[in-house]
């Protein structure tokens, strides 16, 4: 039955695929029946979503720094338009997850947050003060004495995972000592204390963040560390103009990191480019440190491709995954697309959207390599930005282009994506009148086009936004994300899913819950030879195009195969993987 169903589904999918490929991409507006069918198919899928009550062996958190709702929507359209579609009708990978919620991002002392305090919230489960990292609200900005007090330190979910015997990893396109990754291992009264050269008089007596990563718990036990920031470790190559944090103590912390692993009898490697990363054999490597830039990693569009270049976010995530999957007890992995934030601070929407698409690519690649029955995957942002989508552009209008209507005040065009503040403030005075720059005189689709902003914010940086951000989840206990939550709830929900940290002894599932993986699983009642673990080969991984076809043509598949046939197999893990790559809700 299984192989018959497999052949039938693939046959129908192939017919659909050939039918689509044979037709040129259409940018026509959809008719009435399209919307009716789309809604009915989505309703059918929603009615068949099941909650996964398993204990998560693995937890993977993807963080799009600054990827608020507007940035997410713009990235979705941008992705679709790069594929030749109108754009609005598409999806980012995580938008197909079965569970979603909103998160309130404010800090203890700020209505609009920064990335250090938000990282402390979603990684440590405690909201805290602006610009502080891995400490509770008893520590105010720059208070070194309070920041040293271990009573005020907030352990992260990465530390909880280590205490449960899991391997851990952090991957980022920013400096590895930056706010998001830093909250997994560091405790600092000031997020800028990334190296001793930045401590100043306020930080005398405090340990810098890079030093904490190399020598303190839990940093020195992190199995995979991939990102930028060689300067903070005293290992800068000196070939970059940006100097952000220069060590004054003369130490090379990358060598100290290697020495620590050697002392503990572990195999460890330090790499600085794509070629060296590619050559790493996961089976021969216990610890991996990769620092690919003196400061932040290059933007995706600037990244040098080749052995001497920098790895992409996807490259780093997949290498980290290969090392961490060796752990019999599972793992926790944080993957940050951190430069979305930097582009938005500069009012550079094209760069920001390219970074978001790089994150989308990383998420899609990782989903193919993990078992979603035992892996919780969440995708979220730490905060938003003040970018807006405005005007009334036509359907399919280039997301980086101009709105067709002119302003009735100054009779000038404007772009769909603009900012309420930032360095894009671009006005001049002509005969005692303030005149806005005409964006039609430049290429607004250029990678370095700076969108207009209403208010200048010195010195050059746009601010964050204070509205809620979204979180998407799939896998064990993903249904815990279900409404508007405080941002610090995220760490608690992830810990409960994996039965670690505060939930190590308190992660009971209700009596009606069913389990297919892990310590709470009941004996299988599936037919012999069905499903994973039976020794039979898994179905081949679906291409994104074929996956989208299956998602969008559920009713056609039901019609072709018959309702009873579909019902007979839609609950098996194998066909769930075929129809949804195990990362998406049931299609039938």
Please identify what each model-predicted range represents.
Residues 1-4:
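N-terminal secretory signal peptides that target proteins for export/translocation
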Residues 6-22:
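Cleavable N-terminal signal peptides of Sec/SRP-targeted secreted and luminal proteins
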Residues 25-41, 52-58, 67-73, 77-120, ...:
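A post-motif C-terminal structural segment
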Residues 560-588:
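Long, low-complexity, intrinsically disordered segments
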Residues 134-151:
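His/Cys-centered metal/cofactor-coordination and adjacent catalytic loops
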């Amino acid at each position: 039955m299984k192989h018959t169903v497999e052949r039938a589904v693939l046959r129908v999918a192939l017919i659909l695929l050939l039918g689509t490929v044979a037709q040129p991409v259409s940018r026509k507006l959809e008719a009435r029946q399209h919307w009716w069918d789309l809604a009915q198919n989505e309703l059918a899928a929603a009615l068949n979503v099941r909650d996964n009550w398993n204990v998560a062996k693995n937890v993977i958190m993807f963080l799009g720094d600054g990827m608020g709702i507007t940035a997410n929507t713009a990235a979705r359209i941008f992705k679709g338009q790069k594929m030749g579609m109108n754009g609005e009708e598409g999806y980012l990978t995580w938008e197909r997850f079965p569970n979603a919620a909103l998160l309130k991002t404010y800090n203890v002392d700020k209505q609009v947050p920064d990335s250090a305090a938000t990282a402390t919230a979603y990684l440590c489960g405690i909201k805290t003060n602006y610009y502080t990292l891995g400490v509770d609200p008893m520590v105010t900005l720059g208070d070194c004495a309070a920041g040293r007090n271990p009573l005020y330190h907030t352990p992260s979910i990465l530390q909880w995972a280590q205490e449960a015997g899991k391997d851990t990893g952090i991957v980022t396109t920013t400096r590895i000592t930056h706010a998001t990754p830093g909250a997994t291992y560091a405790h600092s009264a000031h997020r800028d204390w990334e190296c001793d050269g930045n401590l100043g008089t306020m930080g005398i007596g405090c340990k810098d963040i890079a030093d904490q990563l190399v020598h303190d718990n839990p940093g020195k036990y992190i199995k995979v560390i991939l990102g930028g920031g060689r300067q903070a470790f005293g290992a800068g190559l000196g070939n970059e103009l940006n100097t952000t944090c220069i060590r004054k103590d003369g130490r090379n912390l990358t060598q100290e990191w290697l020495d620590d692993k050697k002392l503990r009898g572990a195999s460890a490697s330090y790499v600085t480019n794509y070629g060296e990363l590619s050559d790493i054999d996961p089976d021969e490597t216990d610890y991996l440190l990769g620092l690919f830039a003196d400061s932040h990693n290059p933007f995706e569009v600037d990244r040098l491709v080749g052995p001497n270049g920098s790895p992409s976010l996807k490259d780093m995530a997949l290498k980290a995954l290969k090392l961490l999957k060796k752990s019999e007890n599972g793992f926790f992995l944080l993957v940050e697309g951190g430069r979305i934030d930097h582009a938005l601070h500069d009012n550079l929407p094209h760069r920001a959207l390219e970074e978001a698409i790089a994150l989308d690519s990383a998420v899609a690649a990782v989903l193919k390599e993990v078992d979603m029955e035992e892996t919780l995957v969440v995708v979220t942002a730490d905060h938003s930005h003040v970018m807006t989508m405005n005007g009334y552009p036509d359907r399919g209008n280039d997301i980086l282009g101009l709105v067709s209507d002119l302003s009735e005040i100054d009779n000038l065009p404007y772009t769909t994506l603009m900012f309420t503040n930032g360095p894009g403030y671009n006005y001049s005075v002509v005969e005692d009148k303030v005149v806005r720059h005409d964006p039609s005189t430049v290429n607004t689709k250029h990678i370095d086009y700076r969108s207009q902003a209403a208010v200048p914010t010195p010195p050059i940086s746009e601010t964050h936004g204070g509205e809620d951000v979204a979180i998407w989840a799939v896998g064990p206990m993903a249904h815990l994300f279900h409404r508007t939550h405080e941002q610090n709830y995220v760490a608690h929900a992830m810990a409960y899913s994996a039965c670690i940290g505060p939930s190590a002894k308190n992660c009971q599932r209700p009596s009606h819950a069913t389990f297919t993986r892990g310590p709470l699983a009941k004996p299988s009642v599936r037919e012999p030879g069905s499903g994973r673990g039976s020794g039979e080969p898994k179905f081949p991984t679906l291409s994104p195009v074929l996956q989208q076809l299956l998602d969008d043509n559920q009713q056609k598949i039901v019609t072709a195969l018959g309702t009873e046939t579909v019902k007979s197999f839609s609950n098996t893990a194998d066909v769930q993987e075929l129809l949804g790559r195990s990362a998406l809700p049931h299609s039938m």
